[in-house]
Regions:
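A short acidic, Gly/Pro-enriched loop at the edge of an enzyme's catalytic core
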Residues: 331-342
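Conserved class I S-adenosyl-L-methionine
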Residues: 235-273, 286-290, 310-313, 371-397
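Flexible gly/pro-rich beta->alpha loop and the following alpha-helix that scaffold active-site loops
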Residues: 24-89
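A short glycine-rich, Lys/Arg-flanked "PGG" loop and its adjoining helix->strand segment in the class I
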Residues: 356-368
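A short SAM/SAH-binding and catalytic strip from SAM-dependent methyltransferases
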Residues: 342-354
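Class I SAM-dependent methyltransferase SAM/SAH-binding core
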Residues: 278-332
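Pocket-forming structural segment of enzyme catalytic cores
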Residues: 102-186
Length: 431
């Protein structure tokens, strides 16, 4: 099994006039299809993120602190996205729900805030992945009466006098906007038509829209273009984490019988006491005991894994003390050139987006003469038969594909075994 690359961005709408507008335009420009859940039309909120590359929650007339149809399901989606760091963007009600999902509290404000008004960029905005470059004072459209108390660890990005929380970030993947940065002229007209009594409290709402939108548009488009680029860049990572997170707790029990084969494979690396070993895509840490045994107490063992829940599983199995665990992308290792003497990787190379790039990166961090061991506890033919498909001639692990790919990356293949009970390829770093 392997993660399926995300195919779309899930947008949850709560009202017909509160669509994604400029957000949707940016996603489309980045080649990201949008799947819309229109709760206002009776669409059920999905039970899971599925293959979504990002989650966008729009505004609506409901209150985030009151129960409404779909609220529980939306909070569950938000918490799932936060856990696996799938990018999230919440607008107005969506921002308040995001805060609630992370442990904050939404509540009634001091009265409605409707119409055009400035927000002030907070100091943290200048270094934010989305808000960097936004001016200190930005004219935006307000249309809300509620506010929120931010959850612990949130970063404030924008505020105003009446409503101190106007934009915030959670971690490095989730943003909440209380104001309506997404609007264009069609959106302003739709809001005014849907809520005429509220619009009447801001007499210049529609008349001043062209002027305010002209000032807003460059920054609006830049923010959402950055969000779309971030989603596209992290799509594979999002797929991997979404796929493996719910499986992590039972991963070790499911494949416990494979342990001896992992140990036997590690012995083929020829590691020496005091050496430096790296397990890329370490999962629940099944190879870490054998790697530690080979390099001894004076050696170094590193375990790299992209899914946080897998590192939690490693600790649960009592293996966290055997290695230094790093959460990182296998193709962007946080290691110096020549940092390790041996690299072990099980069931990973044929699932990364760019196997050639992975082999080059692993060569970069390997010392001259270092060993790379690619392993799987079953052979290619057995796995293909298990999944009811023929052998793939384009499989990166096929010898006719793997040997030249290794050579191009600076490795020399010196052992290739594709048996029924294991796959093993051993290569040496040559240049």
């Amino acid at each position: 099994m392997s993660p399926v690359p995300p195919t779309d961005v899930l947008v949850v709408e709560h009202a017909p006039q509160e669509g994604p507008y400029a957000i949707g335009t940016a996603l489309e420009a980045a080649g990201l299809p949008v799947r819309t859940c229109r709760t206002w039309a009776g669409d059920p909120v999905p039970d899971t993120l599925g293959d979504a590359a990002a989650l966008v929650l729009m505004g609506g007339p409901a209150a985030a602190y009151e129960d409404f149809s779909g609220r529980t399901a939306e909070l569950a989606l938000l918490r799932a996205a936060l856990e696996v760091e799938v990018p999230v963007l919440g607008v107005c009600l969506g921002a308040q729900l995001l805060g609630e999902a992370a442990g904050g509290r939404s509540r009634p404000g001091s009265g409605p805030q409707i119409g055009w008004g400035e927000v002030r960029a907070a100091p943290a905005a200048h270094g934010d992945p989305l808000f960097a470059g936004v001016p200190e004072h930005l004219p935006v459209l307000h249309w809300h009466g509620d506010t929120m108390d931010l959850p612990a660890g949130a970063t404030l990005l924008a505020s105003c006098d009446r409503f101190p929380v106007q934009a915030f970030r959670l971690g490095g993947s989730a943003w909440g906007l209380q104001f309506h940065l997404e609007v264009d002229k069609a959106a302003v007209d739709a809001f005014a038509a849907a809520f005429p009594d509220e619009a009447a409290t801001a007499p210049d709402l529609v008349a001043s829209a062209p002027r305010n939108l002209a000032a807003l548009a460059p920054h609006r488009d830049a923010v959402f273009a950055r969000f779309a680029a971030l989603v596209a860049d992290r799509a594979e990572r999002s797929a991997t984490r979404t796929f493996f997170t719910p499986k992590a707790a039972k991963w070790e029990a499911r494949f416990a019988a494979d342990g001896p084969r992992y140990t036997a494979a590690v012995l083929q690396m020829g590691l020496r006491p005091g050496g430096r070993a790296l397990d890329v895509g370490c999962g629940s840490g099944r190879a870490l005991p054998a790697l530690r045994a080979e390099v001894g107490a004076e050696g170094v063992v590193l375990g790299v894994e992209l899914t946080p829940a897998m590192l939690t599983a490693t600790a649960k199995e009592g293996r966290a003390d055997l290695a230094r665990l790093l959460m990182a992308d296998a193709c962007r290792l946080p290691l110096a050139d020549g940092a390790v003497d041996g690299i072990f990787s099980a069931g990973l190379i044929n699932h990364v987006p760019d196997p050639a790039a992975a082999l080059r990166e692993w060569a970069r961090v390997s010392a001259p003469g270092g060993v790379l061991l690619l392993f799987h506890p079953s052979g290619r033919a057995e796995r293909a038969a298990r999944h009811g498909r023929p052998l793939d001639p384009d499989d990166p692990l096929a010898e006719e594909n793997l040997r030249p790919a290794l050579h191009a990356a600076g490795w020399s293949l010196d052992c290739y075994e594709d048996a029924s009970l294991h796959f093993l390829a051993r290569a040496v770093r040559v240049h």
